[in-house]
UniProtKB/Swiss-Prot annotation:
Transmembrane segments: none
Organism: Gossypium hirsutum
Catalytic reaction annotation: ATP + H2O = ADP + phosphate + H(+)
EC number: 3.6.4.-
Keyword check for Plastid: no
Record Pfam families: Actin (PF00022)
Location within or outside the cell: Cytoplasm, Cytoskeleton
EC category: hydrolase
Name recorded for this polypeptide: Actin
Signal sequence, renumbered to the chain: none
UniProt superkingdom: Eukaryota
SMART domains referenced in this protein's UniProt entry, alphabetically: ACTIN
Length: 377
């Protein structure tokens, strides 16, 4: 990495639902596409159509009617490395149009992930893509960088996993990190179920994508769930209609806030877990008593599942109810929070002080994949 001046590091935030990729120093990711690999359900009959045996990302999304869609990442953990390799290949060569052997690569992962997951990521980057250097950073820590803070508790909720990470003066407090395997995809599944009760059937992997779109466009979080339910029974003010791809129009009312309510009441989908407000509170309570005040005053939301309207107010209300009465509570919801992990990665990879943190290919060749645990937090 001697002539590191003209080489921009690549930042790749591999989410369960979306891949966000781009160049360090940019203020937004260049490529954002679904983490999907699709394989044809039918056999091709027309010669010369150039049919592929696998489609990745947006192309898989647009041809979803004839494909079986698979997500290689579930709950933040890669469960299909061949497909994951296809996604990275697509990211580097088709989306960013770069040669990975010429750029250091910064990858992200969820906290409390299995060690093997991180080692395999390292191995693929060095052995398959021949990266000159790489680094694996924790997603929530990057979100805090992006918000310009060094102290705070980050609630990062994406498509596959939510986690709370308290950070004090730049140090993550690993004993207080909590992870909740409840996130956007579970909400989409919950909405599929609720809509089935209404007589609309969504079953295939392609139809799940339609429901995800309904969720993203129409769902919101009620400040007072019970009261909102009462209102929805008597008035039709919250009903909205959505046009399906085939032109059929469906109306959704109470489903709009029933679906994301699962974040606060996981028992609604039969999960025995604390909601996001309680998880955040529990995480703060695991920290030293002297720093709790700073954490309560800097609760930072990040990730796509925190994009629901009303989430910051509700979060504030729920945590105020749990915390000591005199405590000042501030929930920060930056407008760019959907991409704040990526933005934080872009900031981190372009810091001059970060340059000695990279794992170089030579170090990898010497020690093997386990080096990632020594060099990355």
């Amino acid at each position: 990495m001697a002539d590191g001046e003209d080489i921009q590091p690549l930042v790749c935030d591999n989410g369960t639902g979306m891949v966000k990729a781009g160049f360090a120093g940019d203020d937004a990711p260049r490529a954002v596409f679904p983490s999907i690999v699709g394989r044809p359900r039918h056999t091709g009959v027309m010669v010369g159509m150039g049919q592929k045996d696998a489609y990745v990302g947006d192309e898989a999304q647009s041809k979803r009617g004839i494909l079986t869609l698979k997500y290689p990442i579930e709950h933040g953990i890669v469960n299909n490395w061949d497909d994951m390799e296809k996604i990275w290949h697509h990211t580097f060569y088709n989306e960013l149009r770069v040669a990975p052997e010429e750029h250091p690569v910064l990858l992200t992962e969820a906290p409390l992930n299995p060690k093997a997951n991180r080692e395999k990521m390292t191995q693929i980057m060095f052995e398959t893509f021949n990266a000159p250097a790489m680094y694996v950073a924790i997603q929530a820590v990057l979100s805090l960088y992006a918000s310009g803070r060094t102290t705070g508790i980050v609630l990062d909720s994406g498509d596959g996993v939510s986690h709370t990470v308290p950070i004090y003066e730049g140090y993550a407090l690993p004993h207080a990190i909590l992870r909740l395997d409840l996130a956007g995809r579970d909400l989409t599944d919950a909405l599929m179920k609720i809509l089935t009760e209404r007589g609309y059937s969504f079953t295939t992997t392609a139809e799940r994508e339609i429901v995800r779109d309904v969720k993203e466009k129409l769902a919101y979080i009620a400040l007072d769930y019970e009261q909102e339910l009462e209102t929805s029974k008597t008035s039709s003010s919250i009903e909205k209609s959505y046009e399906l791809p085939d032109g059929q129009v469906i109306t959704i009312g109470a489903e709009r806030f029933r679906c994301p309510e699962v974040l606060f009441q996981p028992s609604m989908i039969g999960m025995e877990a604390a909601g996001i407000h309680e998880t955040t509170y529990n995480s703060i309570m695991k920290c030293d008593v002297d720093i709790r005040k700073d954490l309560y005053g800097n609760i930072v939301l990040s990730g796509g599942t925190t994009m629901f309207p009303g989430i910051a107010d509700r979060m504030s209300k729920e945590i105020t109810a749990l915390a000591p009465s005199s405590m000042k509570i501030k929930v920060v919801a930056p407008p760019e929070r959907k991409y704040s992990v990526w933005i934080g990665g872009s900031i981190l990879a372009s810091l001059s002080t970060f340059q000695q943190m990279w794992i170089a290919k030579a170090e990898y060749d010497e020690s093997g994949p386990s080096i990632v645990h020594r060099k990355c937090f």
